[in-house]
Amino acid sequence: LLHLRWQKVIVGALLLGQAILFSANAQTSSYYRKHLEHYDDKPVHYGFLFALPVTRFGIVHSNTFLTQDTLNRITAPATAGFRMGFVVNGYLNDSWDIRTTPSVSLYDRRVQYEYAKGSTRNELREATWIEIPVLFKYKSQRRMNTRMYMLGGMTFGFETNVRKRLRQGSDFLNTRGSDLTVDYGFGLEQFLAYTKFSPEIRFSHGILNLFRSNDLNTASNGIRRLTSHTVTIYLMFE
């Protein structure tokens, strides 16, 4: 699982590095036009985004799991989702911006139970979430048409299909319908002729316990705490 998660992160880092190399090579030419030269004079900018989140549950086992002898492992493999939304960026000063990226995310989080007799059971949590982050962005100095940045903040999210999930059956894995995460990441701003393109990698770690006990689901009795962990590759246009 750890190998799979880091493989996704490495792929994203390589894509971002490739964009940086492309920008650096372009600036070595003898003539280079500075696009959107007065971009920072406008206090607020709007845009849209597409993103690929790779997400999983972080599991803390309960005392029941430690004392029983029928269940060997409970794991949460990383799975890919999809996200799209809007960008609202407010200028604070030459170094700092405040940003929000309200978005709709489609997640397929999975919990896998491995039993002592060799059998396995998978529970898939398909969910649609609306997520609203508040982020502070620290910007480097602009070098012609390129600028690096780091950002951090928090995101509040809530699930929109809770009733549908509850109708699926009372013996399913039960989780909370809201979450709060700590977010941080880095990205590259590339100023083009008519827009600004920003690839970004962002890490999110949930601080709320999403698990709700369910006596009808005996396998989940081995879980005490579930938290969300997500690595997301963003493509933003402003």
Language-model-detected regions and their locations in the chain:
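Predominantly the C-terminal beta-signal and adjacent terminal strand-loop region
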Residues: 177-179, 184-238
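Outer-membrane beta-barrel channels and translocator barrels
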Residues: 41, 93, 141-145, 191-193, ...
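Outer-membrane beta-barrel translocator domains and adjoining extracellular loop/strand segments
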Residues: 59-65, 111-118, 161-169, 210-217
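Residues that define the transmembrane beta-barrel architecture of outer-membrane proteins
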Residues: 42-44, 78-82, 126-130, 146, ...
